């Protein structure tokens, strides 16, 4: 079965991360599938909204480290960057149902969602610094904007996780429900959107995001440049080696 499932029904495209045995860690092939699904949904006038979902126990553990190291994103045409451009510029409403851990891009993609519904077991983290890297998905801009600088610093500089209640308080999450209800709630809200005039949805979203579109695009490029450079530096090499060897990284001599 595919690691990415797509289903279009009654004006809603649902994209499901379907690699639970690997904690929904995302491979380049999965990014490519999601990027293509967004391209098709953007062009399809019958699609009024998109929902991202995982499993009741896990949203995503972030990048699949082994796959990532074997096929490091080297250009802005890499699948991960095509996906990020696709979700950040998507003109129609994007929703997410998030339960369990949402690590790295599992959290940063949510900054590009219009409505996020979390299970009460959701836990969010952006541990890029812990891996000797820097933020991606324009999260270095969007996290301080959404969370406030202090909380963003805890999340990005310290890499500290935060739970659903904190995410609700800072506005990253729209509502918290039991994990068994999150996907259904996201679908109900998406169906409400699908019943509304598409032109009004698109124009309202455009106006709400007016002023940040170019900044987000520029920041993604800047982050990608830094990310690519840092991947080749000693801190990242130590972090990934430690991960593969199942030990804590030692940055004391770097």
Annotate the PLM regions.
Residues 29, 33, 79, 86, ...:
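Charged catalytic carboxylate motif
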Residues 1-55, 85:
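Conserved CoA-thioester-binding segment of acyl-CoA-metabolizing enzymes
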Residues 88-201, 228, 233, 238-241, ...:
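Crotonase-fold acyl-CoA enzyme core
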Residues 214-219, 253:
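Short beta-strand->loop
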Residues 205-214:
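Short, charged, surface-exposed hinge/linker loops at domain edges
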Residues 32, 39, 46, 54-89, ...:
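Glycine- (often His-adjacent) and acidic-residue-rich active-site loop
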Residues 15, 19, 34, 52, ...:
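Terminal peptide-recognition signature
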